[in-house]
Amino acid sequence: MALNNFLFAQCVCYFLAFLFSFVVVVPLSENGHDFRGRCLLFTEGMWLSANLTMQGRERFTVQEWGPPAACRFSLLASLLSLLLAAAHAWRTLFFLCKGHEGSFFYAFLNLLVSAFVVFLVFIASTIVSVGFTMWCDTITEKGSTPHSCEEFQETDLELNVDNSAFYHQFAIAQFGLWASWLAWLAITTLAFLKVYHNYRQEDLLDSLVHEKELLLARPTSRTSFQGEKSAVI
């Protein structure tokens, strides 16, 4: 019963990781298409007036687009999380239906993979959160403009890109990444508990085998001692 509960908890966590990763992949892919391969994260720019005699900000000019590697890394990390979560969810569901338990090697390998994904998704989450905050600070000039970052997606920035949904896309991506990270953190914790349980179980089995050998050796020792005593008499 305990094994089934443990496998069910793992299966639920894998399903959540798959779901949240899917939530990340879709908006990031859409944003890459809308921005024609340009990366919004860490983009530098400023507002310029078309006529220096006029007051107010009329046109946003990008000085340097963000590094494409930032968006690609976040998308690839989400795809890797999606595929691994799907594969492990299927395997765990198979174990749950059959009532089987994985080997110690599989549990240890699962721990390593889960820890690696936790690290990878954490980096991707940080990149997206920090990069998107820098973009919003740039177009709002750190809050000095009359419009918020979300409101600017309703304004044509004239950057030769489709910026009509960038805020919602990255808001959803941020939520999905951090939620996926929490799901993988729970998976890693369960994997560690599984490895620790298997390690303690193997120690217990070794102790039982050792005690059995000692018990089997005691009658032999008593018999030899009685034989020596009879010979002396």
From Swiss-Prot:
<keyword id="KW-0472">Membrane</keyword>
<feature type="transmembrane region" description="Helical">
    <location>
        <begin position="104"/>
        <end position="124"/>
    </location>
</feature>
<protein>
    <recommendedName>
        <fullName>Transmembrane protein 179</fullName>
    </recommendedName>
</protein>
<dbReference type="GO" id="GO:0016020">
    <property type="term" value="C:membrane"/>
</dbReference>
<feature type="transmembrane region" description="Helical">
    <location>
        <begin position="6"/>
        <end position="26"/>
    </location>
</feature>
<feature type="transmembrane region" description="Helical">
    <location>
        <begin position="75"/>
        <end position="95"/>
    </location>
</feature>
<comment type="similarity">
    <text>Belongs to the TMEM179 family.</text>
</comment>
<feature type="transmembrane region" description="Helical">
    <location>
        <begin position="170"/>
        <end position="190"/>
    </location>
</feature>
<keyword id="KW-0325">Glycoprotein</keyword>
<dbReference type="InterPro" id="IPR029673">
    <property type="entry name" value="TMEM179"/>
</dbReference>
<keyword id="KW-1133">Transmembrane helix</keyword>
<feature type="glycosylation site" description="N-linked (GlcNAc...) asparagine">
    <location>
        <position position="51"/>
    </location>
</feature>
<keyword id="KW-0812">Transmembrane</keyword>
